[in-house]
Regions:
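P-loop NTPase "switch/coupling" elements that transmit nucleotide state to mechanical/effector output
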Residues: 4-189, 196-199, 228-254
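Long, amphipathic alpha-helical segments that form or neighbor coiled-coils/leucine zippers used
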Residues: 203-210, 214-245
């Protein structure tokens, strides 16, 4: 089952599998990052969007359209509509090349009596890095490629910082992409990254770079994975305490 199928299956279970005593509210937003500019894909209006830090420490895009959705069909309809507004262009290697990064977000709120649970699912489609010598990009295509490559490089810097075992500064603010994904790369997040590669020999150098990036991503530990070393250390400490208590008991018996 591909990632897209898993995504729609999970949404179907979300809408149809909830208990009868749960009130569900789901809101969808969709934007692209084009030449370091945030563009709302759920409306034809072009207003300036900025990432702002909220009072709870999370980040949000002010002015971004959010659509309430109550079914999988509504989600699909908005996604298809938003996709038609995404920036595409042609170059020597691709007639319909994505010229932007896309972020589709679903904010979910579940209410049961006095309990409220909230969560967010971000689906991110990154534009591929481009070697200008192969794409033959000029003019607008050249500017777009430079912006894409710069933001992907910033994402690589963030991944490198997160992969380090010692705490260090993580350069989230180096691009709109990484700043917007800061919450998705936090300690509480669960992240799945899929890297697309080409089987063609002509693309071997790009494939090697993509695999190297995937290997760095594999070294990043977030959420439960990050907590594992602490849990293991706690277990060792408890075992040591039990061993010391047993030793004290034996010494006490010998003293009698």
């Amino acid at each position: 089952m591909c990632i897209r199928d898993r995504y729609f299956r999970a949404l179907s279970e979300l809408f149809h599998g909830k208990p009868s005593d749960v009130e569900l509210c789901v809101k969808l937003s969709m934007l692209e990052i084009y030449n370091e500019t945030l563009i709302d894909l759920l409306t034809d209006k072009r207003i300036k969007l900025e990432v702002k830090r909220c009072g709870d420490g999370t980040h949000a895009v002010q002015g971004l359209t959010t659509q309430p959705v109550a079914s999988l069909e509504e989600v699909q309809r908005h996604v298809e509509s938003g996709s038609t507004r995404r920036q595409t262009g042609s170059h020597d290697l691709n007639d319909r090349s994505s010229r932007s990064h896309l972020i589709l977000s679903l904010d979910v709120e579940c209410r049961r009596k006095d309990e409220v649970l909230t969560s967010r699912l971000n689906l991110v489609d990154l534009a591929g890095s481009e070697r200008l010598s192969r794409t033959g990009a000029t003019g607008d295509r050249l500017k777009e490629a430079q912006s894409i490559n710069k933001s992907l490089s910033s994402l690589g810097d963030v991944v490198n910082a997160l992969a380090k075992k010692t705490q260090c500064h993580v350069p989230y603010r180096n691009s709109k992409l990484t700043y917007l994904l800061q919450d998705s790369l936090s300690r509480a997040a669960r992240v799945l990254m899929v890297v697309n590669i080409s089987p063609l020999e002509a693309d071997a150098s790009e494939t090697i770079c993509s695999l190297a990036f995937a290997a760095r991503c594999r070294d990043v530990e977030l959420g439960a994975a990050l907590a594992r070393p602490e849990a293991a250390e706690l277990m060792r400490a408890k075992q040591e305490i039990r061993a010391l208590k047993a030793r004290l008991d034996r010494l006490a018996l010998a003293a009698k």
